[in-house]
Amino acid sequence: MGSLKNTWLRRIFRWHSWLGLLTGVPLLLLGLSGSVLVFKPELDHWLAPRVAPPPAGRAPVPLDSLYRMVGHRYPAIKKMAIVGFPQRPGECYEFRIYGNDGNPHTYDLAGVWVDPYAGRVVQEGANTGLAGGALNWLLQFHFCFQLGMGGVLLTALLGLALLASVATGAVVYRKQLGKVLLLRAPLRTHSWRLLASDLHRYVGTWALLLNALICFTGFWMNLFGFDPAAWRAQCQPAPPNQLMARPVDALLATARAAYPELVPTRIRLPTHPGTPFEIDGVVPGHALPWGPGAAVQVDPTTGRVLTVRRAWQAAWPAQWEALMAPLHFGTFGGWPVRVLYVVVGLTPGLLALTGFALWYRRRAGAARA
């Protein structure tokens, strides 16, 4: 029995080693980009283009006019949304464009910044380049490595691989987990091999549960990469726009009257019939842990309120989906939690480096023997 157990432990150790070697570089890139994206809202605001403040007494351009201007500028897209709102003079609306050129190996998102008083485009560009916003480029890289649906599938598989690496690592170091967590395992610094081994064990143990949570939620959000229907949809170019007849400002007023406590974080603007006008946002007192788990939908043809959504009152499948993004990016617990996510996001890179050092040392020792 002992021999069989040792055989299985050696096999699990080899799996752990090869998982780390094969996925180390992409997981390093995902960890680094994810650590930056934890503070994407603040960085977006800091990096966003600015315009001259408007003259005193000048009224902003109606949102409906901006919607139609952007819709004619991008005449064949799946949808658009407003994801950034001016809070002070000189700030712009940020529109997000959801295009589809029929190529499943590209992801056709773009950013458009619009002066709310002059009604002109200040900056625009696809998320495959920096003109679409440096953080938008980084988010798309984190999401799919800028490789379209193939990248979505790859990042989902990497999430599974990291989960397997966490599980096999927990088995390999199972007898030392308690000592490491209680700080009873010394950090040996008298040789680089021992230091690498101890760092690998310490970092992997302390980040184990949060790394498992992050990689599982990332896998779950990219699960559609396994769906053939999603691939087929990406092969269908977006048809020409059919913009809403009813003014955006009227729909916005209806939505706000139906859900006055909702603080908008995104306004989804249909470009084709059959898609509702929707405001997503947060409700004070219910922001944690749901993130933007509240929404109101309005029929753009009739102006009738369709749904008012509160994730904390929904059935568990809807609650589950609403939790995924906040748990993945650490947006559910304020600054201390977000800083913790930044630190843990750096650990896959450190684990990859220390793991490679240990593998290389063993390989070199075997060659000398």
Would you name each region that the model predicts?
Residues 1-369:
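Conserved histidines in hydrophobic membrane contexts and catalytic metal-binding motifs
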